[in-house]
Design a protein with these regions (language model features):
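Active-site Tyr-X1-5-Lys
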Residues: 1-19, 35-50
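A short, flexible beta-alpha/helix-coil linker loop
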Residues: 20-24, 62-63
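C-terminal substrate-binding subdomain of Rossmann-fold SDR/epimerase-dehydratase oxidoreductases
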Residues: 39, 45-167
Length: 167
């Protein structure tokens, strides 16, 4: 659609297609949020209740690519100001991990002093087996995600705490 509009009206509109986004002010509702904010909330509840297990949906092998919201915002500004010959550009990190790997990383960052066992609820769906974007075009134009994962998790978690306890 952008391409047709650009051809007809001589505009330079671009469509950026982001991968799964996370960060401050996300939706952490247990039933209608995406897996990552739901996982942050679940880990927080385990931390509060001093639980020794976390249960995640499916077998934990579904793969997801994530991008921190600040990187996505930076990409939007970058490409608004960049002359490009393509109307659709995927925005992401170009790397994915399993749900289990993300769970392990979040546990290590948010509850570093405790060993929590990951259990799998096989009665729940795994979701799409893999969600990973080809970000080679964004890289070709000089854009890459820059945010440190651990720092972005801490910032996101602090936002979750503010959102949850300052209502």
């Amino acid at each position: 659609m952008c391409q047709s509009y650009n051809n007809q009206y001589k505009t330079r509109y671009k469509c950026l297609m982001p991968t799964n986004t996370y960060g401050p002010n996300d939706n952490y509702h247990g039933l209608n949020s995406h897996f990552f904010p739901a996982l942050i909330k679940k880990i927080h509840e385990i931390k509060l209740k001093n639980k020794k297990n976390i249960t995640i949906w499916g077998n934990g092998r579904a793969r997801r690519e994530l991008i921190f919201v600040d990187d996505l915002a930076e990409a939007c500004v970058y490409f608004m100001n960049k002359k490009v010959n393509h109307n659709l550009i995927n925005i992401g990190t170009g790397e994915d991990q399993t749900i289990k790997q993300y769970t392990e990383k979040l546990l290590k960052i948010l509850i570093p002093d405790r060993k929590v066992k990951i259990k799998f609820d096989l009665s729940k769906p795994n979701g799409t087996p893999r969600k990973l974007l080809d970000v080679s075009l964004a890289k070709k134009y000089g854009w890459v995600a820059k945010t440190n994962f651990k720092n972005s998790i801490i910032e996101t978690y602090n936002s979750y705490l503010d959102q949850s306890y300052n209502k």
